[in-house]
Amino acid sequence: MSALRQVMCRSTASLQLYQANRAAAARWASTATDGGPLDPKTALARPEELEQRNKLSGKITVPTAVNLSPISGVPEEHIRERRVRIHIPPKNAMQSGTDNVNTWQIEFDNRERWENPLMGWASSGDPLSNMNVQFGSPEEAITFCERNGWRWYVDGAAKPKKERVKNYGINFAWNKRTRVSTK
């Protein structure tokens, strides 16, 4: 037999096998109205279970205005009259380069402070005065403040870093005519 004939016989045999499998599957398939096989989880379930599954499979909608202040545990007098400053913290003066300059931070306004008579420490009755929370963007910080019921304001904006001109290094660039040849 030639190679072409062998390939034709194989493809014909595989086509016949495919058609036989398809016919057998059609015989064993469900006689449901959609024509497809039934899911065993739904076929054997009681109507109450199906109704409960349909309720649980739906989407849960949350109102857009979420107020976390009643469940945060912070006293009411610290929530009502607070004002939050959203800002970019200044760059560290140590040798950290530009590390931690791309974050936004919230900071609360100052409340009454007094000097502790025993130790001389600065004291405050405000639990939120020393809390600093960092965020990746001002929008995240604004959302956080609104959910907690605090008034806020954005102080300063993100300033893009200027590209510095490197004057001295340009003198030794390989593609400039300022280099003096030694020969």
From Swiss-Prot:
InterPro entries: NADH_UbQ_FeS_4_mit-like (IPR006885), NDUFS4-like_sf (IPR038532). This is NADH dehydrogenase [ubiquinone] iron-sulfur protein 4, mitochondrial. Disruption phenotype: RNAi-mediated knockdown results in mitochondrial membrane respiratory chain NADH dehydrogenase (Complex I) deficiency. Mitochondria in the flight muscle shows a wide range of structural abnormalities including dispersed cristae, onion-like swirling membranes, swollen mitochondria, sparse matrix and irregular cristae densities. Eclosion rate is reduced, locomotion and feeding are severely impaired and lifespan shortened. In the brain, there is a pericerebral fat body deficit. The modification Phosphoserine is found at residue 181. Belongs to the complex I NDUFS4 subunit family. It comes from Drosophila melanogaster (Fruit fly). Accessory subunit of the mitochondrial membrane respiratory chain NADH dehydrogenase (Complex I), that is believed not to be involved in catalysis. Complex I functions in the transfer of electrons from NADH to the respiratory chain. The immediate electron acceptor for the enzyme is believed to be ubiquinone. Transmembrane segments: none annotated. The lineage of its organism: Eukaryota, Metazoa, Ecdysozoa, Arthropoda, Hexapoda. It is a peripheral membrane protein. It comes from the Eukaryota. Residues 1-28 form a transit peptide.
